[in-house]
Amino acid sequence: MEDLPPDYQDQDLPSYETITNTASTAVAPPTRSTLGPATLYISGRFIYSTDPQAPPLYEFSHSIGYLHENDRSVKVERVDQVVKTSAGISQVVLRNRHLFDLKHPTAAEFPNFAYHAEAATRRVLCSFGASTFRVGGILRHGKGYRFERAVKGADRKLEAQDALFEVNPSRDKAVGYEWRDAQGELIAREVKDEMASMSLVITAEMSAEMRDALVAAWIIRIWCELSNGDHSAMRLMMVRFKTVNAVGYAP
C-alpha cells in the first residue's frame, strides 16, 4: 500500500463545488461527477480557463515557463471557490487544495521514473510516473510520452501499474500533442494560439479527479521538454494579458 496523508476532514472543501457555511450549519453541496470540455492555458504559476472573469483553476509552486533540470519538486494545488455566509451576507472566497507533488529525482536516487506525480491526498486519482518513447520513422520522428499509474514498492520507489495517458506528436501543425486515455480515446490536444502560447484543449468529458491528473501530467510533459532544452516550450512565457480580480491572483 502506498503511504498517503490522512484524508480531508469534513471541514475541508469539496471538489469543484461550493458550500454554504453558517454559524450553526454546513449545507452539503450537490455532487458533480463529470466535467465537460474546456480550454486551459498557462500564465506564470497559474492555469486559467478561457473565462476572463474567472479566478485561476490551479496554482503551482513554480512559474511553469521557468522550470528546468535542477528543479526537483513542484507543488500542485487546485483553487476551489467557496461561498461563505455570515450574518446573512454571502462572500466568495478562494482556497487551495493540495493535490500532487511533481517530482524529478536525481540520477543518484536510481528512480524508476525521471518524472512522476505523488498524490498528496487520497481524493486524487492516483500517483503516476512518466516515460518517453520515440515515434515515427526515418523521415519523420519525434518523442511521445506515456503516463502510468504507480504505487510504491518494497524499496519505497514508485512502480508502474496500469496505463493512464499516452501522448503523441500531432500531424496537424496547429496542434503540438494529442492526449489519449487508457482506452486509446482522444481526450485533449495541445494547441498554439495567436500569441504563440500553449493551451490544453480538453475535448472529452471526464471526472474532476481525471482532469486534475491530466493537468498535472501536462505540466510534467512541459517540464521534461524544458529540462531537455526544447526551446519551443519557452513560448509558455509569452502569455496573454489577464485581468486580475480583487482576490489578488496575478499571472
Residue ranges with predicted function:
Residues 1-26:
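Short acidic, low-complexity intrinsically disordered linear motifs used
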Residues 20-244, 250:
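Cationic, beta-structured binding surfaces that engage anionic biopolymers and membranes
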